[in-house]
């Protein structure tokens, strides 16, 4: 099996999407029958034509201009990269892959994102992208967290700062276990 530089291919893929905004360069990093699935919204596609259409009209040029991806961790295997990051942006445009059909709210959003990228013959074959959609909806004002075990921006901040308090959503239960034998 050839030793492909997965990190270089992955970094070029991300650069093509988020910096160069170049659909053709993005597609050049992928195998012809690649699959992309933004899991919470089931957006993406399978195969060259469907993915090129998705990237051209619903992804590459539709990010808010202030989007920032903050790396948290990366695990590299023989044919897989798992990237953990925090995405920060202001919801100033329709973002089809993240909030399909939701008009801009002007609100700030910070969300942890995990991407599982699989490679085949030195090119990207599959991306599964995960984030907490409830947190996004709370942050843009479309979901009231009252009485629900969900949080807004706090989840991203906790990923970036492990010293922030844990167990806030189960405060009563946490307090009830205080002083018990461990």
Predicted feature descriptions by range:
Residues 1-182:
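C-terminal and inter-domain tail/linker signature
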